[in-house]
Amino acid sequence: MKKMKLDERIRTDLGPGEGLLGFFVAQIPFKFWWFFLVGPIAVLGIKTYYIAASDKGMHFYGMNIVGQIEQHDYFPYDAIRVLEMKSGWMQMPLRFEFKNHNELKVRAQRKGAKTVPKLTDDLINTLKEKLKVRC
Protein backbone atom coordinates (compact mmCIF):
# COMPACT_ATOMS: atom_id res chain seq x y z
CA MET A 1 0.00 0.00 0.00
CA LYS A 2 1.34 3.43 -0.89
CA LYS A 3 2.46 5.76 1.87
CA MET A 4 -0.06 8.49 1.01
CA LYS A 5 -3.02 6.08 0.81
CA LEU A 6 -2.00 4.56 4.10
CA ASP A 7 -1.76 8.00 5.69
CA GLU A 8 -5.33 8.75 4.58
CA ARG A 9 -6.57 5.38 5.87
CA ILE A 10 -4.91 5.85 9.27
CA ARG A 11 -6.35 9.35 9.66
CA THR A 12 -9.87 8.01 9.03
CA ASP A 13 -9.41 5.48 11.86
CA LEU A 14 -8.25 8.06 14.40
CA GLY A 15 -10.69 8.97 17.14
CA PRO A 16 -12.04 12.48 17.74
CA GLY A 17 -9.32 14.81 18.98
CA GLU A 18 -6.61 12.24 18.26
CA GLY A 19 -3.55 13.37 16.30
CA LEU A 20 -1.21 11.19 14.27
CA LEU A 21 2.41 11.29 15.45
CA GLY A 22 3.82 8.94 12.81
CA PHE A 23 3.69 5.44 11.36
CA PHE A 24 6.11 2.82 10.13
CA VAL A 25 6.23 -0.61 8.52
CA ALA A 26 7.27 -3.64 10.56
CA GLN A 27 7.56 -7.33 9.73
CA ILE A 28 7.52 -10.63 11.54
CA PRO A 29 10.05 -12.79 9.67
CA PHE A 30 9.29 -16.44 8.94
CA LYS A 31 10.74 -19.11 11.18
CA PHE A 32 13.89 -20.46 9.56
CA TRP A 33 13.05 -24.10 10.26
CA TRP A 34 9.95 -23.73 8.03
CA PHE A 35 12.34 -23.33 5.10
CA PHE A 36 13.54 -26.92 5.60
CA LEU A 37 9.98 -28.17 5.91
CA VAL A 38 8.22 -26.46 2.97
CA GLY A 39 11.06 -24.89 1.02
CA PRO A 40 10.79 -21.44 -0.58
CA ILE A 41 7.06 -21.31 0.19
CA ALA A 42 8.09 -20.46 3.77
CA VAL A 43 8.67 -16.87 2.63
CA LEU A 44 4.88 -16.51 2.42
CA GLY A 45 4.91 -16.74 6.23
CA ILE A 46 6.26 -13.20 6.56
CA LYS A 47 3.63 -11.06 8.31
CA THR A 48 3.65 -7.32 7.60
CA TYR A 49 2.27 -4.66 9.94
CA TYR A 50 1.89 -0.93 9.67
CA ILE A 51 2.12 0.53 13.16
CA ALA A 52 0.83 4.05 13.77
CA ALA A 53 1.44 6.11 16.89
CA SER A 54 -1.13 8.71 17.87
CA ASP A 55 -1.60 11.02 20.85
CA LYS A 56 -3.69 8.45 22.72
CA GLY A 57 -2.43 5.03 21.63
CA MET A 58 -1.02 2.68 19.02
CA HIS A 59 -2.82 1.40 15.92
CA PHE A 60 -1.69 -1.94 14.47
CA TYR A 61 -2.66 -2.73 10.87
CA GLY A 62 -2.10 -6.33 9.77
CA MET A 63 -1.61 -6.79 6.03
CA ASN A 64 -2.38 -9.81 3.88
CA ILE A 65 -0.15 -11.26 1.14
CA VAL A 66 -1.37 -8.83 -1.56
CA GLY A 67 -0.82 -5.77 0.66
CA GLN A 68 -4.38 -4.96 1.72
CA ILE A 69 -5.32 -4.20 5.32
CA GLU A 70 -6.66 -7.37 6.88
CA GLN A 71 -7.06 -6.35 10.51
CA HIS A 72 -6.91 -3.24 12.66
CA ASP A 73 -6.20 -3.24 16.38
CA TYR A 74 -5.98 -0.25 18.69
CA PHE A 75 -4.29 -0.19 22.08
CA PRO A 76 -4.15 2.87 24.35
CA TYR A 77 -0.72 3.56 25.80
CA ASP A 78 -1.76 2.33 29.24
CA ALA A 79 -2.60 -1.12 27.75
CA ILE A 80 1.03 -1.55 26.62
CA ARG A 81 3.17 -2.61 29.56
CA VAL A 82 6.64 -2.44 27.98
CA LEU A 83 8.19 -1.60 24.62
CA GLU A 84 11.60 -3.18 24.21
CA MET A 85 13.87 -1.66 21.56
CA LYS A 86 17.14 -3.12 20.39
CA SER A 87 19.68 -1.50 18.13
CA GLY A 88 19.68 -2.03 14.41
CA TRP A 89 20.93 -0.27 11.33
CA MET A 90 18.47 -1.30 8.61
CA GLN A 91 15.80 -2.73 10.90
CA MET A 92 15.16 -2.26 14.60
CA PRO A 93 13.81 -5.22 16.60
CA LEU A 94 10.84 -4.17 18.74
CA ARG A 95 8.89 -6.18 21.30
CA PHE A 96 5.53 -4.91 22.50
CA GLU A 97 4.41 -6.49 25.77
CA PHE A 98 0.75 -5.86 26.55
CA LYS A 99 -1.00 -5.92 29.93
CA ASN A 100 -3.05 -8.96 28.87
CA HIS A 101 0.27 -10.90 28.72
CA ASN A 102 0.40 -11.01 24.92
CA GLU A 103 3.47 -9.89 23.06
CA LEU A 104 4.31 -8.88 19.52
CA LYS A 105 7.87 -9.15 18.19
CA VAL A 106 8.50 -7.23 14.98
CA ARG A 107 11.38 -5.72 13.03
CA ALA A 108 10.69 -2.07 12.25
CA GLN A 109 12.10 -0.58 9.05
CA ARG A 110 14.73 2.12 9.75
CA LYS A 111 16.16 2.74 6.26
CA GLY A 112 14.88 2.15 2.76
CA ALA A 113 13.05 3.64 -0.20
CA LYS A 114 11.19 6.94 0.14
CA THR A 115 7.85 5.27 -0.49
CA VAL A 116 8.21 3.04 2.60
CA PRO A 117 7.19 4.57 5.95
CA LYS A 118 10.14 4.21 8.31
CA LEU A 119 10.71 4.42 12.06
CA THR A 120 12.33 7.84 12.51
CA ASP A 121 14.38 9.13 15.43
CA ASP A 122 11.62 11.63 16.28
CA LEU A 123 9.06 8.83 16.53
CA ILE A 124 11.45 6.75 18.65
CA ASN A 125 11.85 9.65 21.09
CA THR A 126 8.08 10.17 21.21
CA LEU A 127 7.50 6.48 21.97
CA LYS A 128 10.12 6.65 24.72
CA GLU A 129 8.17 9.52 26.30
CA LYS A 130 4.77 7.82 26.01
CA LEU A 131 5.73 4.24 26.94
CA LYS A 132 7.96 2.46 29.40
CA VAL A 133 10.85 1.54 27.11
CA ARG A 134 13.66 -0.94 27.64
CA CYS A 135 16.66 -0.48 25.37
Language-model-detected regions and their locations in the chain:
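Anionic N-terminal interaction surfaces
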Residues: 1-51
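Phosphoinositide-binding peripheral membrane targeting modules
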Residues: 40-50, 54-95, 102
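Canonical phosphoinositide-binding patch of PH/PH-like domains
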Residues: 100-122
